[in-house]
């Protein structure tokens, strides 16, 4: 609280452009935070490829896919698998409920944020009318469904920026230290909603410049 109060006092003095406040994670330890919000599990992808930067592709200086209606609002789903739709495949942007995701993928899939295991209903209906019940917590996919076909790894920020400027990719972020063995690892499965080359990278809470990321292919 002292840090927050000091920061807000400096904000009133014109030293900062934003204020700070306590949130739901303020009293958690680092381990508790990882257990609550980080569901990504690293795996050896059978269909993984390496993202190649196009030779003739100019990376846009900034892009915000939210302005184009490509990204649904962010949900606070703790360590459950993220729920989102792909407007480029479906021509409509519908925010699916967590209950729909639970019923469609089952308990284990919700806990394991695996890139290549996710699939969605192409109709993107928030109700269960698009699904045929097979047994509790499992669904039979209809003929119109599509799924993630694989991923492409990006070993640097420039490659990730190249992919992100072309579409809004889903990425797996490893934000631990550059060590073979690391016991303090914070990971997450995220949707990049945009980027801006002018933003101050040195002030990021984690060094993202050389971390691995994967772009979901559909």
From Swiss-Prot:
Where is the region Disordered? 144-173, 195-218
The record's listing under InterPro entries reads:
Papain-like_cys_pep_sf, Prot_inhib_I29
| Family classification | Belongs to the peptidase C1 family.
What segments bear the compositional bias annotation Basic and acidic residues?
201-212
What is the protein name stated in its UniProt record? Putative inactive cathepsin L-like protein CTSL3P
Q: What is the lineage of its organism?
A: Eukaryota, Metazoa, Chordata, Craniata, Vertebrata
Q: Which domain of life is it from?
A: Eukaryota
Q: Which Pfam families match?
A: Inhibitor_I29
């Amino acid at each position: 609280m002292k840090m927050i109060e000091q920061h807000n006092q400096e904000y009133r003095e014109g030293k900062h452009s934003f204020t700070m406040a306590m949130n739901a994670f303020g009293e958690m330890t680092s381990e508790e935070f990882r257990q609550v919000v980080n569901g990504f599990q690293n795996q050896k992808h059978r269909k993984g490829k390496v993202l190649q930067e196009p030779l003739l592709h100019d990376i846009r200086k900034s892009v915000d896919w939210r302005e184009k209606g490509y990204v649904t609002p962010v949900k606070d789903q703790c360590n459950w698998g993220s729920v989102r739709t792909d407007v480029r495949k479906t021509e409509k942007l519908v925010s699916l409920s967590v209950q729909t995701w639970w019923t469609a993928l089952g308990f284990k899939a919700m806990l394991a944020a695996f890139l290549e295991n996710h699939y969605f209903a192409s109709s993107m209906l928030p109700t269960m009318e698009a699904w045929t019940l097979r047994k509790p917590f499992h669904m039979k996919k209809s003929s119109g469904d599509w799924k993630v076909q694989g991923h492409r790894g990006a070993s640097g920020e420039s490659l990730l920026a190249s992919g992100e400027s072309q579409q809004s990719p889903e990425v797996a972020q490893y934000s631990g230290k550059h060590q073979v063995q690391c016991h303090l690892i914070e990971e997450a499965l995220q949707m990049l909603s945009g980027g801006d080359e002018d933003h101050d990278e040195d002030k990021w809470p984690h060094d993202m410049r050389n971390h691995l990321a994967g772009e979901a292919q559909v």
